[in-house]
Amino acid sequence: MASVIEQCQVVPSPGSATELTLPLTYFDHVWLAFHRMRRILFYKLPISRPDFVQTIIPTLKDSLSLTLKYYLPLAGNVACPQDWSGYPELRYVTGNSVSVIFSESDMDFNYLIGYHPRNTKDFYHFVPQLAEPKDAPGVQLAPVLAIQVTLFPNHGISIGFTNHHVAGDGATIVKFVRAWALLNKFGGDEQFLANEFIPFYDRSVIKDPNGVGMSIWNEMKKYKHMMKMSDVVTPPDKVRGTFIITRHDIGKLKNLVLTRRPKLTHVTSFTVTCAYVWTCIIKSEAATGEEIDENGMEFFGCAADCRAQFNPPLPPSYFGNALVGYVARTRQVDLAGKEGFTIAVELIGEAIRKRMKDEEWILSGSWFKEYDKVDAKRSLSVAGSPKLDLYAADFGWGRPEKLEFVSIDNDDGISMSLSKSKDSDGDLEIGLSLSKTRMNAFAAMFTHGISFL
């Protein structure tokens, strides 16, 4: 559990713009009904409560306020028309703020940062819920970001983030976190804030010659009864586990695939890692005792940053969502067999390869239809990316000891988190949330398979 020390609202620092409104693009609309994103960073820092209250809390509030001067929409709200007659938008006005909770916990810090299976419910004490939406003339206003900082006396600190995906994708949120970390580490000296952390807000760079925005918005309105502006969370009865796949093992997996399929052209660290996890997940299902349909379809889905796929490319610091989805699918029996891993690599690689530089495909909106025939309960999806390095977020206390993607706990299917390893360049860190039985079976297969490479 966590007891509250202080709950406050942090506003952007003086000198910030008085208002900012960003229309949602078709890249944003698709996330309106999506569950909230939750991440926790754990830092080893052996400090006492008095030090936490007297030094850590004031500096974090000051640096967050300064960071929000650059990231105004995160202090604002998503404004959704109550009659659904117009597009939603991100809206900031003077006085808007981010809810921040400072708390203290006596839970075992070393247990939480472990790699072994841990109860998923334990982590929800350290991520905040977004405040309830409020009615305003003609619209409903829902906050898009909340933060919780928790002290584990004489052991460490965690920083939990909850955000509405409609505000921005992983690239946007990670840049915000790293900007905050830099300003906190260097005492608010803005000269340390490199251009890559200064958001680009011009939404006119998102081209829409085919009216994709209207098409997707009309499609999303069909599901408005499913869109909950409230942040409702029920922690599932699962365990969380973390697995490391080394650069050396990734190289062996690539060689294994290319020995069997020498003509494959998109064999990357991402494709072999995801394919290996996918096949281990499929094979672990037998341990649950549930009936398995060998001819049933299995799905793999991932979202990729498409900023560089436009002509001209969007700025890397573009604020918002710029993701397109890739889907691979095949029968259960194909993945469970001896050639399952190779088949998975080929399917995932081909799904990405044929679309990775296809601006026309993006502008046609076809990527939105990729998920139409996906059975969510038979799917594995990916959260995070090795390209987004939250382990680089140093608030002045050193690199994080552990990163947890709490939002992979959803019950619709199985999600895996994927990030750089904190300890070694080229190694990847995989997070999973499964039933205890399934996790044990997965861990055995994951370890056994790697040992025979």
From Swiss-Prot:
Monomer. Gene3D superfamilies: Chloramphenicol acetyltransferase-like domain. It holds the Pfam family Transferase. GO terms for molecular function: flavonol-3-O-beta-glucoside O-malonyltransferase activity; malonyltransferase activity. Highly expressed in flower. Also expressed in flower bud, stem, root and leaf. The active site is at 165 (proton acceptor), 394 (proton acceptor). The keyword Acyltransferase applies. A motif (DFGWG motif) lies at residues 394-398. Belongs to the plant acyltransferase family. Phenolic glucoside malonyltransferase subfamily. The HXXXXD motif is essential for acyltransferase activity. Its EC number is 2.3.1.-, 2.3.1.116. Malonyl-CoA binds at residues 254, 266, 268-269. This is Phenolic glucoside malonyltransferase 1. It catalyses: a flavonol 3-O-beta-D-glucoside + malonyl-CoA = a flavonol 3-O-(6-O-malonyl-beta-D-glucoside) + CoA; a flavonol 7-O-beta-D-glucoside + malonyl-CoA = a flavonol 7-O-(6-O-malonyl-beta-D-glucoside) + CoA. Signal peptide: none annotated. InterPro entries: CAT-like_dom_sf, Plant_metabolite_acyltrans.
